[in-house]
Amino acid sequence: MPFRLSRPTCQSDPPGRRVPAAFRAAVLLGVVCAATGLLAQAPTGGGSQPSEIQLVISGEPGTPPRYAVPDFIADAGDMGRTLGQVLWDDLNFEREFYMVPRDTYATIPIARSADQVPFTAWRELGVDAVVFGTVQRPDANTVRIQVRLFNVRTRQVAFAKEYSGSAANLRLYAHTIADEIHQQQRALRGVARTKLTFSSDRNREKVNGPVQNRDVKEIYLADYDGANARRVTTTRQLNITPVWSPDARAIAYTSYRRGYPDIFIALIYQGLQENPTNGTGQNWLPVFSPDGTRICFTSNRDGNPELYVMNRDGSGLRRLTNNPAIDTTPTWSPNGAQIAFTSDRSGQPQIYIVGADGLNLRRLTTAESYADRPTWSPAPFNEIAFAARTGSGYDIKVYDLAAGTTRQITFGEGTNESPAYSPNGRHLAFTSTRTGSSQIFTIDRDGRNARQVTRDGNNFTPAWSN
């Protein structure tokens, strides 16, 4: 039976067989040093929008409203252009609005104040909603932002808010505005303020250890669009498969810092680390339960790679599976009642589901020759994404649990694997080699709008914060 290893090693793929990185990490097989203040704090809103502003802007019948986001009016530097571009990108990401391209605004007069907004010119351009914003810098470290969303037809204000705080958080203000507009106009939880964590070799370092010339990989985090990437670990060892805690304040991952795989948790605001498995056996691929109190992971502590569940602090350990095969890559259902995972008990890796109590095991994928690395969607979607062998490569597929059907969302552009859902379930992050190196991409759940997130080095196994 393939992949039957009693101890994870950093060997290369068997001749003639290319094994997806996620399953390879499971049978091969982060931590530490996150500085205090690694993540920027959210900007402060200057009070809630007036209660009478509840206008929802619509487009022509059967079409989304057309939005325009020109540069904010700024008293210094490129702050206004940055806010305008980032906000446009954020609103465009969710596809709830048709975003009128910014390069078509050249003929529109620039408004220096809200009472100068040229509604007639915007209407002639076919715009339904326009953002007007200003940004001031009262001192070197502070910005003050005002933003209004106008209904171009009625000239009424549909959204208005003020923000103030650190000038270093300029992009975060734009993300916040986008999420609040999506919430107010579409009752949609946007993802502009969310973050991705991933493993990367971008530091290009090498170390000698139990496995010679092993590539160093560290854990990184970045904004959902790839901006503001920063390093979480500095162990100069192999650190892989990071996952977020539900409160987005901690990252659990697998680290080879001791020469074998073990589970660590980086507390990213405190700059501290935890090691809940405490070096007992070899442990890898942790994942938090939806309430954050438990961790499911793979361990060979009893001689074979099996799934275990423990409390976050390492107490309450119990074994979930008991099979001679390899059971790995767990993912929790949104209600915490079930766990999907990869097992090669049928001869090739396939996706299975088991109750969180270890009962009611069933095989999910039956039409795939090879299926790996499941990830369970958040509500209201009821589906599991996974990587599947397709011809000579690997692509992302989605299994609809209600309908019992599978759809494919990537199609032969390199190797595509390690999917991870956004917290609103509308997007997936994944690893792809379509550009010639391993990079993180995002894609809508219907397979449209693939976007490259990382470019520096090689990047692997993304996870999306709440």
Residue ranges and their predicted role:
Residues 189, 200-218, 234-238, 254-264, ...:
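A flexible loop/linker signature enriched in serine peptidases of the S9 family
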Residues 113-180:
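Amphipathic beta-strand/beta-sheet edge segments enriched in Tyr/Trp
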Residues 243, 287, 331, 375-377, ...:
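Conserved beta-strand position repeated across blades of beta-propeller domains
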Residues 49-118, 131-137:
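Short beta-strand->alpha-helix linker/helix-N-cap micro-motif
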Residues 196, 251-252, 292-296, 336-340, ...:
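Hydrophobic beta-strand positions that form the internal "hydrophobic ladder"
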